[in-house]
Amino acid sequence: MKYKVTNFLLIIFLSINVISSEIPPYSAKYNFESEEISISGIREFYKTENGFEMRFKASNLFASLFFLSKFEIKNSEVISGSYEIKIRPKFLDRDQYLNFDYETMEVRSEGINKWVGSLKDDLVYDPLNVQIMIRTNVKHGLKNFKINIVDMEEGGSKSYEFNVVGLEECIFNGETLKCVILERSRLNSDRKVTYYLAEELEYMFIKIIDASPERTNTLTLLEVLSLG
């Protein structure tokens, strides 16, 4: 999904644009599990005076995770603003902050990974707000699409391809839901991310499995606290 710089700036700055989200606000409890940690927390998506925010906050006896994305939504497009990661204990050393600057057309990273990347004429998403764009595209009935996601370690962005690979019945809290199965991949990469999106829950993620030869991370929905 590419835009010329002029069109891109128009999307951001024209006041006549529609500022809304097709995905309703929600709060839900998820469990994140990897080889290093298993932890449950609350993921929230909500509107603020300056746009939208999405966050995930979790903690247990040994660690705490905090992820925060600030962005705008205009004409069904997510416009990244900032992205923040805070992880404790400190020895995990993963704190990072991204700022998307549309005057200089740069994204700047501070923290464990310091770099400055060019936004060029592409829309670039962070690891949290991209999920709003994914759900919006699936809700629109798109079967395949491409999205640019920021490269947290090296800077810049990488283009990923998303393909709907099937429909499946998912069991959540004893109820049977219709789930869209979506796969994310990238050329010359062994990493694959599989999303299970429940139609009855406004295409909320029931499960996300991020698998590569090195590790597998899983995010699983435990409870919907609020929707809409």
Describe the role of every protein-language-model region.
Residues 21-102, 142-228:
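Acidic, serine/threonine-rich low-complexity disordered tracts
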Residues 15-17:
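N-terminal signal peptide c-region/cleavage motif recognized by signal peptidases
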